[in-house]
């Protein structure tokens, strides 16, 4: 009885807070059938002016959808709107228009969609793990707490949450501690409990159109992920799945740093399908086609960052770069070289699409060199 009362109280408190591959790629293996409309998306985070790496990803996404007779949507991933620079979204939109990368419909803004994310969260709360607990639980750990007890994986800086607060639910003492902290209004995030490492549900596999067969154990490789931050901001991992499925996106092109996230997002999509969330909105979850790109680094081999104004598109435009020069350079970084030339060639977005479509195997030039690319003569 104690546990039942505590669980009910925990759910009510959370709801109230929320209110406020194969080596041989064939064309038909990685492209949609003619009866399926490819819908891609530009999904930039307007945390600053886009850099050239962002433009490479935007162009690649546009090429993928357009080459399949589809179209693009534009979604501004501004969940943490308080930290977004003023006019950053407008500048992103202007840069895309300037480059000739078009989309259909009006842009959508994630900060305006918190109600639908809350609904998705509540759907996940209704699901239980193997121990009969809700898949959503409160986490009182700070980032420094987690860094102190967990090591980054694979040298990419990713830190797997060790499950400290999840383990509190395993004992009566831990449950009492959770209840006390909630009663004291202790700040906490909400996490999504992944299956145990030895559970078949923890293994997620998919074919990436560029990097090939991928397989992740979402327990060992990712761990329990934050679904809503302590300040009430919903996580990227939840919002992106909700928005992609509800808007019909089925063609996702982005950087390889999100390969790991693809597995988690597939699992979240399947959970929301199981919960009935998507059916309630007249859609069903279907796995999208993924293509993850090598990253773009600067001359020192460091990843480009908006915060460092790395190869800022605005600065390049002010320096006299034309849209054709930008598109040509992005195609060069993707490995698509016009007429065998080994230097970037200016071209329009339409020219880039024709060049992309001239290759027999989609993404063949990208797969020929999966190493991250550097742009030394632009730094």
Label the model's feature ranges:
Residues 3, 139-141, 165:
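Disulfide-bonded cysteines in secreted/extracellular proteins and peptides
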Residues 2, 7-47, 72, 177-183, ...:
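Non-catalytic terminal extensions that flank enzyme cores
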Residues 95, 120, 149, 164, ...:
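Residues that form generic nucleotide/phosphate-binding pockets
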Residues 133, 144-305, 312-317, 376-379:
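Active-site cores that bind ATP or allylic diphosphates and position pyrophosphate for catalysis
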Residues 88, 117, 245, 261-264, ...:
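Alpha-helical structural motif
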Residues 51, 85, 142, 169-174, ...:
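Helix N-cap and loop-to-helix transition residues
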Residues 80-90, 298-300, 354-364:
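Short, mixed-charge aromatic SLiMs
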Residues 30-156, 257, 261-285, 340-347:
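N-terminal Rossmann-like or analogous alpha/beta NTP/dinucleotide-binding catalytic cores
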